[in-house]
Amino acid sequence: MDAFGFLKVAAAVPHLGVGDCDYNTERMAALAEEAAQRGVEIAVFPELGVTGYTCGDLLLQSTLLDAADEAFGRLVRATRKLPLTLIAGLPLRHGTTLYNCAAVFTQGRVLGVVPKSVIPGYSEFYEPRWFASGAGISGERIDVAGQSADFGTDLTFEVNGAEFGIEICEDLWVAVPPSSLLAAGGAKVIFNLSASPEVVGKHDYLRQLVAQQSARTLSAYVYCSAGFGESSTDLVFAGNALIAENGRILREAERFSADEQLVVADVDLQRLEFERRRNTSFRQAEATPELTVIEMEVPEGLRAAALDRDIDPMPFVPRDERRRSERCEEVFRIQSHGLARRLRHTRCQKAVIGISGGLDSTLALLVAVRAFDFLGLDRRGILGITMPGFGTTDRTYRNALQLMRGLGVTVREIPIRDACLQHFRDIGLPPEDRSATYENAQARERTQILMDVANMEGGLVVGTGDLSELALGWATYNGDQMSMYGVNASVPKTLVRHLVRWVADTAEDGATRATLLDILDTPVSPELLPAEADGSIAQRTEDLVGPYELHDFFLYYFLRAGYGPAKLCYLAERAFAGSHDAAVVRKWLGVFIRRFFSQQFKRSAMPDGPKVGTVTLSPRGDWRMPSDAAAEAWLKELDTLS
């Protein structure tokens, strides 16, 4: 396990000869060597991989059982110099009883043996014909490969600080899998040795089962099933190998391959520890029988320079087009239903929204339109107010008007220049002073207009600020920070853009679609400073606070995974390789940390708004933080990277 908590694991599917133990263990040794070269720390082979699963009644023959034990002993010795831990399946006798077992070994030593608990005897499965259940066995020893090892279903293993547990095939398919108890007892990785034949539709179910069990146990789950080489007398084995982590499949093998396969992934034990700390329900899991933890230190092997793990630079936005469209539809529904519920509760039939021609106010308006349609209210009850100021450009002004007209809402225009100039005179601010007061006064003037119009009309002010702005505090306190209901408060900027594009792609009106596309093409800006001489936007948000794609990346992994600055940099430098170098990543991470801590007071007073995802900053919900917390520990860690 590396300094960031990544553990490199593998599911190894070797060539196999049914009953040919020498050949089978030779192939295992070869794959173990390959795994070591790739920096793997723990690798698992299929169920009964030493003999083959489909030996049938030959499993009762002493000749095969002796051959399996001898061949396994050679495998243990052949891999003794490899810096990794291996898990292999073989039949083992204990007294007069035969068990379907998983043996854990490293450095020439067998650490322990786990018997299969659930022995299936239905459909194509006849395991009770040969094997007994190992459920409940604890505190015993078993002879294997000339060694005596711990034997039982109460075993977990800790190698270089990484604790893992084992279950075998059918163990996963029951109401309470052993892995649930092992995880509750501390195991963060579960290895499953399997020999599961293919039938139509089973693979999809298996993928869901593995993913769900990893989510339910807040663990990494490494599943390795027998492949090409098992007998096809009545069954076909496709060589399924899956590595999942907390509900997400990280890697999987090619099915029905005639080649040996080594599926490798880095699983994030540090993140799993964080998830278990924050998940109070996991901590309340049913008490488990006392587990026996077998500890072992293994010499550090080859640590691959590249992570065997996909680092998504856009964690809020699905890459797959179909899933992205489904995500946008779901988010849009949550937003609009939240607003609809608030409108119905307050008996408001009017909504007031400031429309700037930018992304956030556009999304808020689209959400309001959907909410009004859902409630059967007249869209003219939506009062879209454009409030041109000192920095408003022709482009955003035009887009604001065209969008409102295209959607059929009530359009109002209330310029703020004169009111702001009068305010500057009242407080003694020279109009040429371009300080924060100059900018914030405009934002507060706009909010005052919206609030007063809402009072006049008996309406509700719909907030437009998004999650990214809340994280950075990129809003004027008691200005655009305030509303009566903030529909975008849980939507990050990177997702806002895709939501608007999704609406544009489905828009029936060509003019409205063209307006939405032009809004998408407009630089993000608060437009609080006068435009350039050519009329273009002078104030670009991402030039001032940094790229939103970086900030959303930091925000997601800081809140959702609990990563510190060092790990955030490590991952961001890989996720954004080719677009943002290390210096850029560290610069903007420093900005993110400083602003996130210093601007909490704005979030502490934020209005109500719907939660749409697992990352949100409502002080009444997912994020509790004092407004006067110090950022020094995080900044100090960041400084050590420079």
Where are these regions (language model features)?
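Enzyme catalytic cores with a strong preference for nitrogen-chemistry domains
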Residues: 1-354, 370-379, 411
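ATP/NTP-dependent adenylation/nucleotidyl-transfer catalytic domains that generate, transfer
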Residues: 24, 160, 219, 231, ...
